[in-house]
Amino acid sequence: MEMRVQDYGADIKLMDTSFAYIDGTFQAELPAGDVYVEMTKGFEYEAVRKKLRIESNQRELKLEISRFTDNRSKGWVTADTHVHFISPSTAILEGQAEGLNLINLLAAQWGDLFTNVGDIPQGPLTSRDGETVVQVGTENRQHILGHLCLLGGRAEPVYPMSAGGPQESYLGDALWNSLADWSDTCRERGGLVITAHFPYPAAEVGAGIVLGKTDALELYPDFGEEFNNLRFLYWYRVLNCGYRLPVVAGTDKMAAWIPVGANRTYAHLGQQEFTFDNWAKAIRSGNTFMTSGPLLFFHADSRAPGEEITLGAGGGAVEVQAEARSFVPFHRVEIVLNGRVVASREERDGVREMTLREKVQVNGPGWLAARCFSKVGLTTSWDLKVLAHTSPVYVQVPRQDLFSESGAAFLMTLIEGAQTWVETLATRPDAERLHRIRKMLSDARDRLHQRMHEHGIHH
């Protein structure tokens, strides 16, 4: 199996340009004369690109980079939920250089190869200033049912790390585990369960959502135009069925052609101490946003993402506010209600700051969120677009339940597809394990089927 990995040092190649990660000091041989320097430090600093004059006898050079906002001082923690193939100490250096507070470094199985497993028993590694932490978890993978980021969990790997599937488990390996089994084990240890690179692979994703086996969905800004992207559209379908799942983001970094935190999560801890457990609690509470550049903050009737608004019968007007700042220009901010744009503001030439305030009419139960988009183009070889999206503020209306027929049909298709695959194509394990997997999928189907009938949807 071909593996394109980074396990040799701290450098990065963005498109055709190579960079080095440094801790604030470095030595380099430079020619006398004009040279160009480029510096970045994540999403809260002004990027620098300028020409310098190097004198023939010069031995020292001082370079400065300025911070235009400090969200850590406002109670926010920024994290990459999904990183592979670097050592914890290298992850600390790269995380500090990218302005990250938390890197979730994931051990994984790749056929006969196991990576970063030996880093798990030592527990988290913390930078000297206490502001950057590397937490080693696992990515547990099944090539049809799906992948999970299992974070935290008392520094114990969740075995088996893969179950069936070429390039994931052993050749010819049986379906020993479902994603639900892995999720339950991680949660029993106090860990956080994230559906990796939602929704692919997709088969058990629907069952996991219906049974409440996942804490958040990891989204990538890659496919499609702007938010016309199946990752976001499928998330909207899930939300429209009343399943409250916040958004997170990670890079799935596997080599030096993508920086840690190029796609990242912001979570609001407020006055709580920065620990992994408090970060996981903040993720579950839902005050998060994912971003590949812009910093996006949202309130609806002064409620933050993850919180509820209760309206009277028939709904009412809700005052929404979105604020965005970015180290690169962006062009539009939007408010979405149940996935539909209900307010927007656009600057055709691009801006670095924008605020959108509106009153929107909400006639029934649902959710509100903010999103913003830049037209500056792709930022990495993984085709990441520049955008941000908040988790929702939820709207309650008496005696009405949020449920979507098309969303339910989507989830049911996933569940029934998983059942068909297990029965016809999967390499079967022993009878007891097979029964447990069958029962899990059957329970998910029955639960969704019951909700559909409660809403007059015949299936």
Regions found by a protein language model. Name each.
Residues 74-247, 251, 257, 276:
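Catalytic cores of extracellular degradative/oxidative enzymes
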